[in-house]
Structures are given as C-alpha cells and as structure tokens.
Amino acid sequence: MYLSETHEKKWQPVLEHPDLPKIGDSYKRAVTSVILENQERAAKEDNAFLSEAAPTNATGSNISNWDPILISLVRRAMPNLIAYDIAGVQPMTGPTGLIFAMRSRYTSQTGGEAMFDEADTDFSGRNAAGSAVDGYSTTAQGGTNPSVLNDSPSAGAYTKGTAMTTAAAEALGDDSGNAFAEMAFSIEKSTVTAKSRALKAEYTMELAQDLKAIHGLDAETELANILSAEILAEINREVVRTIYTNAEKGSPAGHVTTAGIFDLDTDSNGRWSVERFKGLMFNLERDANRIAQRTRRGKGNIIITSADVASALQMAGVLDYTPALNNNLTVDDTGNTFAGVLNGRFKVYIDPYSANSASAHYYVVGYKGTSPYDAGMFYCPYVPLQMVRAVGQDTFQPKIGFKTRYGLQANPFAEAGTGDAAVINGAGSANANRYYQRTQVANLM
C-alpha cells in the first residue's frame, strides 16, 4: 500500500471513468488501484507464459485483447465488496503474506499479556519475588467489580496494589532475591495464503452470431459478466458466513434468560411492541459494550441482521413519542444491503439471503475501526480476476475461464485476548472471534 499514490495516479482514468460509479472512499480507491496493478502484472505474466513467438515478443493475442474487459470488471467489482464495510481489506502483493502482532507481557516473553485488561496496580509496586512493604492492608490486586464493597468493604473481594516504600525501592537489585519486576514483549506471526476460485463457460460461434444479430449482445462479454458476478457474490457470501460462523455467542448468561437468545417476551420487560423493541436495542448495546471489553479496541459499530429485526429497530424510533429518535433506516431485502445508521453510530446491514422467519431472527454486532488495520477479519485480494480464452481442439468452439486468488485472515488478537492462545492462521475458529457477537432474537412479534 506504500505505492498506492503512484498507482492511483497511473489508474486515474479508470478510477474516474465517467461511465462508472464514483469511488468516494479514499481507501477503496487506494485498494482498487493496487488490485488493478496486480491485475495488469498478472496479465503480462500470462502473456509471456502463453506466447509461442520469440522471447522478444511477449504478446499473446488470445489474452491481450481481453485486458480492457478485465480492467473494467475489476474496476466495477472491487469497490462493491461487502468486506469493505464489515471487515478490513488488505491487498496482497504475493501469494503469501505475514501478519505480525506484538504483545506486551509481564515477567518474560511467555508471561501473561499486559496492556490488554486492567493494569496490575501491584506489579511495579513490588520486587520480582512478589514482596514489598507498602503500609497498606494488601500488596495484591484482586476483583473486578467495585460494587461488592457496598456489601462488605473489608471482605477483600476487591483490592488494590500500591507503590512500595522508599526503603524497599532503594534495596531493589542489591541481590538476586530483590530483583526488579520485569516486563517483555513477544512478536508473533500469522500466515495468510492466497486461495483460488475458478469458473468456466463455453458457447458456440453460432450462438455468438445469432445473439449479436438478434439482441445486439456479445456472447463473450455477457458470459464474462456472469462469471465475474458469480465469483464476486460467492466471495461476499464467504466473508459474511465466515463472520457468522466465527462470531462469539452474544447475550451471555446473566444478561438474558437463555444464553445466546434474546427473547422479547421474557428479556425486554416491555408493555407493548415499541418498549420491547427498545429492550432489543439495549441488549444490542450491551453486546457492543462486550466487544469493547473483550477487544479493548472500541464498542461495536456495525450490525448485520435479518430484515425484520432491522424493521423492529426502525420502529423503536419511528413509532416512539420522540421524533428525535427516528433512526432513518431503509429496510429493503431487494436493494442495497446497507440499511442506514442506527442511533447515529451503528451501521446497519441487511442480509437479504438470511431466513426471515419467526424462529430464525438474529443480529450480529461487530467492530470495525477507522483504520483498515483495525478489524476482526481481513479480506486479502491478490489477483482479483484471471481470464483465459481457449478453443476446443475438436469442436473449435470458444471457451472462457476465470480464476481469482485471495485470502481470508482473522485478526491475530481476535482469539488470543490473554496472549496465551495459539497464533491464528486463516479465518480462525468457530464461535471464537471476539470482534463479533452473535445473538438469536426470539418472539419478535
């Protein structure tokens, strides 16, 4: 991505083509320019591989004629990936790539992770052996909920660590039993590897002639559009379904009657529909807060949901007595998956392919930061479209084929909040990505 400005300048006529939708997002524009550069490089390599002429003439007539179509397909397809909205997009410049994660740790490179959960107020107030004189009742930090102090302030369920005395500090390092407490860091790596998808189509010259004569359509162009649209749709659904599969179960026990299920009849405590829908909104906020607590990156800010749940979220504002709570959500299964912004913060996306029945409502709340590196899942395109045109050796009828290469990679911190879990390679494990929380919604009406 370091050369994206150079790529954008080179591909400016394509990026700003008047017949194509404008790319308003600067990062989408940068990624598209890198992918266009990858596409051109791949096409040149294919030309050289397939040429049967002298080495000085690296041109393949069956491939070079298709470069403009490929460039056009890439330009139209790449900005429309849903991964830009619900995940991060990091283009690859080679078939494999490495993601590095640095973790701060207590004591040694294999110690517990620091700077993730609450800082240990006791760690720097004692020596490496764990002893210090501080004049207070405790030298160890314990507990996570200060509300227990109201029940029994002296019970010791919530304690703090404090600084050591001057005498103890002066004695640090004077012998092996009085060493400084120590910290370290570890560098861990994850590997993302490009995988492939491939489709082909065949047609006859007679079909191409008749289609052109009767409908004015080019058979090769239409089939190329069909194949590329199918590949794009499959990638979109893979990203969405991977997030569904890998998201943690939301609505934990204690928040709701049944863990993972928000029942509007038993959990919202509302008297009528809008009050129940507001209970649903509050539960969604709790899942968003849980993402912040689990990742220490930020509250959840994106929602993927079924159409009826989105409509319920809309009604919670539209049907309320306060017009200021109008959420301006546009719910349409047949149109754009982006429905609108909820409460000025959540971007709501409708999944038009999810089962929209009384027993199958759900929502997934996730977090995606302003930086492309701040997400729970990354889509890593390498070569978006490779097109090959051939002729059947027996029938002499034309054939075309498409291939694409990309990787899916989970955030290295998505499953390793304490730093002790194994390094993640690939999209990660089911029910383990803490950047996303998945909840079933029952008794919506």
Tell what function each PLM region has.
Residues 252-275:
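Acidic/histidine-rich catalytic neighborhood
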Residues 1-127:
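Extended assembly-interface regions of large multimeric machines
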Residues 68, 77, 83-85, 159-161, ...:
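Sequence/fold signature of self-assembling virion shell proteins
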Residues 92-95, 193-195, 295-297:
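Extracellular/periplasmic catalytic domains that process cell-envelope and extracellular macromolecules
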Residues 219-220, 235-258:
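Short, glycine/acidic-rich hinge or "gate" loops at secondary-structure transitions
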